[in-house]
Curated annotation (Swiss-Prot):
Gene coding for it: bedC1
EC number, as in UniProt: 1.14.12.3
One record GO biological process: catabolic process
This protein's UniProt keywords: 2Fe-2S, Aromatic hydrocarbons catabolism, Dioxygenase, Iron, Iron-sulfur, Metal-binding, NAD, Oxidoreductase, Plasmid
Lineage, top ranks: Bacteria, Pseudomonadati, Pseudomonadota, Gammaproteobacteria, Pseudomonadales
Cofactor mode of binding and number, as noted: Binds 1 [2Fe-2S] cluster. Binds 1 Fe cation.
Residues that hold Fe cation according to the record: 222, 228
Name of protein: Benzene 1,2-dioxygenase subunit alpha
Length: 450
């Protein structure tokens, strides 16, 4: 892509709160396209969304032993994630306090300490400054306790590692709220929990991070129309006819009561799952001992064996597909680019052949070269390209689908539930929470919106 196509569009500075409040109109279902392109809004996102939200960093099985570490990002801030001797996890800014060079330049490994390659300042695995070259001769008054990198709060949920820079933010359990119920469809099917398949895929898409987060939060609509038709046909089992693959009409969409999280799923017909993940994975998830145990653990046959092709986003940038078992973080790289970091989880006690089949099918479908992943990326990239036009940014997008069709008292599913899986209720929830974060000066103000 031409370099100019990813250059930020700067059209104004110093957005006022009253102006930001006009960018999303939930009652009318209107989205101002400038939220996907404006550089000044993006800089405010880094401060008010990414510096204050619980962000997914990885899985606990990425760092099994003391000293195991990996490097990743919180927003655009690089961080180091390290397993401690007491089995806890430390997360700290990957920035030396001397001149700002990275403390750790490796993707992952095991270490007893980290040494900056520029001037040799060294830090222990908790991020504490422990050694400064020529300290006695040149830094007579240096208090090393004052010169450690910034440390983040760390909490986990059923194997997933989250971190937050804001000491005043609510705890992770409260932040996730009802979303935990839906996360469990992938994370808690067995008492053994989940483990990662080794390796993280990383690729860059020239589009705004919100397009990706919104689709995984709310958009079953594209899957039920034409976007993935060619990939579905390619994966069609020989004993199924195309006529058998009419998209299911029964399903639900979940919008968090507060927090911007969302999910959607079909209920019942496994044929679409067969076309996407093949008979081996589909059988494992819907029938036999593993499915029966999952149904018992999750509390119903429907939750354990009947939910198909679920999609979900935990606000802002943690997304996954239970059943496909891909988990990814959408790392923002300016208003016009996102870096995707994706990994696959499996039930820790699943047979080896099932784990291998999940690995193979996820690579085929939702990976850097996956058939469905490329469909999604093509749409997002083209939208972002079109939004370089002045007129293209001047008219609102429609987000009216299934407005006024939610209930708050579903007998099984918590949160605000739409009984029409083809809904944009969760998308409206995501943008409504984005707006709260962009217009709230601190977490005390955010708590008041709950």
């Amino acid at each position: 892509m031409n370099q100019t196509e990813t250059t930020p569009i700067r059209v104004r500075k110093n957005w006022k709160t009253s102006e930001i409040e006009t960018l999303f109109d939930e009652q009318a279902g209107r989205i101002d396209p400038r939220i996907y392109t404006d550089e000044d809004l993006y800089q405010l996102e880094l401060e008010r969304v990414f510096a204050r939200s619980w962000l997914l960093l990885g899985h606990e099985t990425h760092i099994r032993k003391p000293g195991d570490y990996f490097t990743t990002y919180m927003g655009e801030d690089p961080v180091v994630v390290v397993r401690q001797k007491d089995a806890s996890i430390a997360v700290f800014l990957n920035q030396c306090r001397h001149r700002g060079m990275r403390i750790c330049r490796s993707d992952a490994g095991n270490a007893k300490a980290f040494t900056c390659s520029y001037h040799g300042w060294a830090y222990d695995t908790a991020g504490n400054l422990i050694n400064v070259p020529y300290e006695a001769e040149s830094f007579a008054c240096l208090d090393k306790k004052e010169w450690s990198p910034l440390k983040a709060r760390v909490e986990t949920y059923k194997g997933l590692i989250f971190a937050n820079w804001d000491e005043n933010a609510i705890d992770l359990d409260t932040y996730l709220g009802e979303a935990k119920f839906y996360m469990d469809h992938m994370l808690d099917r067995t008492e053994a929990g989940t483990e990662v398949i080794p390796g993280i895929q990383k690729w860059v898409i020239p589009c705004n991070w919100k397009f990706a987060a919104e689709q995984f939060c709310s958009d079953m609509y594209h899957a039920g129309t034409t976007a993935h038709l060619s990939g579905i046909i390619a994966g069609l089992p020989e004993d199924l006819e195309l006529a058998d693959l009419a998209p299911p009409k029964f399903g639900k969409q979940y919008r968090a009561s507060w927090g911007g999280h969302g999910s959607g799923f079909y209920i019942g017909d496994p044929n679409m799952m067969l076309a996407m993940m093949g008979p081996k994975v589909t059988s494992y998830l819907t029938e036999g001992p593993a499915a029966e145990k999952a149904a018992e653990r999750l509390g119903s046959i429907e939750r354990g064996t009947k939910i198909m092709l679920e999609h979900m986003t935990v606000f802002p940038t943690c997304s996954f597909l239970p059943g496909v078992n891909t988990i990814r973080t959408w790392h923002p790289r300016g208003p016009n680019e996102v870096e995707v970091w994706a990994f696959t989880v499996v039930d820790a006690d699943a047979p080896d052949d099932i784990k291998e089949e999940f690995r193979r099918q996820t690579l085929r479908t939702f990976s850097a070269g996956g058939v469905f992943e490329q469909d999604d990326g093509e749409n997002w990239v083209e939208i972002q390209h079109i939004l370089r036009g002045h007129k293209a940014r001047s008219r609102p997008f429609n987000a009216e689908m299934s407005m006024g069709q939610t209930v708050d008292n579903d007998p099984i599913y918590p949160g605000r539930i739409s009984n029409n899986v083809y809904s944009e209720e969760a998308a409206r929830g995501l943008y409504a929470h984005w707006l709260k974060m962009m217009t709230s000066p601190d977490w005390e103000a955010l708590k008041a919106t709950r």
